[in-house]
């Protein structure tokens, strides 16, 4: 006969696996106290920045030059290579967000022919690339 502890452990593993499959892979990375600490740090940084901006605005009474300064040039993000954005969805997520994905596709490509961009069967692991066949 199987011991009660073994049955309880198997039941706990089974319930945990079911809950994990229902959350669609959402796992909190930070604890509540860590989030509070990070928010407090951001507030402190924002307060310090607002003070330094106010001091700079008081000191800079002269009009700004038409050309950007070296500091502003360095502050801009410049892309050196093309950026590719993608995502992976399982069949359940595809069905759940199908209407929103189709609307987004129509917004980006209004003149494209209306055709589904994923398999009708909702194959798992679809990544957006066309199949090699």
Swiss-Prot record:
Cellular component, GO annotation: extracellular region
A Gene Ontology molecular function term of the record: motilin receptor binding
InterPro entries to which the protein is assigned, alphabetical: Motilin_assoc, Motilin_ghrelin, Promotilin
Biased composition (Low complexity): 118-133
Keyword set includes Glycoprotein: no
Keyword field: Cleavage on pair of basic residues, Hormone, Secreted, Signal
Secretion signal, residue range per the UniProt entry: 1-25
Family stated for the protein in its record: Belongs to the motilin family.
PANTHER family on file: MOTILIN, PROMOTILIN
Protein name (record): Promotilin
């Amino acid at each position: 006969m199987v011991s009660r502890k073994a049955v309880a452990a198997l039941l706990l593993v089974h319930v945990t696996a079911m809950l994990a499959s229902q959350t669609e892979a959402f796992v909190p990375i930070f604890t509540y106290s860590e989030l509070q600490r990070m928010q407090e740090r951001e507030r402190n940084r924002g307060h310090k920045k607002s003070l330094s901006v106010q001091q700079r605005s008081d000191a800079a009474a002269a009009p700004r030059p038409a050309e950007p300064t070296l500091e502003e040039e360095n502050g801009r993000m410049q892309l050196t290579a093309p950026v590719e954005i993608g995502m992976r969805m399982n069949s359940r997520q595809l069905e759940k967000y199908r209407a929103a994905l189709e609307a987004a596709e129509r917004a980006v490509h209004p003149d494209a022919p209306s055709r589904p961009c994923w398999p009708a069967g909702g194959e798992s692991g679809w990544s957006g690339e066309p199949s090699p066949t």
